[in-house]
Amino acid sequence: MASKIFFVLAVFLVMSAVLPESFAGCKKLNSNCSRQYRECCHGLVCRRPNYGNGRGILWRCVKAKK
């Protein structure tokens, strides 16, 4: 029984190391983000959107350009 619990914990630790965005509650599209942390969901990047009048002030999660 103890080995099964240990196995589940080991799998969880490996998964959280490999897929941090799925466990840490990643930031969705257009959410505020901070540049130094990779907190946007998979396929999103943290950028300052350009709203036509220069650069935006807030960093947001936006779709990464291919």
Swiss-Prot record:
Source organism phylogeny: Eukaryota, Metazoa, Cnidaria, Anthozoa, Hexacorallia
Organism whose genome encodes this protein: Metridium senile
Main location as per UniProt: secreted
Annotated Gene Ontology cellular component terms: extracellular region; host cell postsynaptic membrane; nematocyst
Subcellular location: Secreted; Nematocyst
Keyword Secreted attributed: yes
Further comment found in the protein's record: Negative results: does not show activity on rat TRPV1, human TRPV3, rat TRPA1 channels, the human ghrelin receptor, human neurotensin receptor 1, rat ASIC1a and ASIC3 channels.
Protein name: Alpha-actitoxin-Ms11a-1
Cystine crosslinks: 26-41, 33-46, 40-61
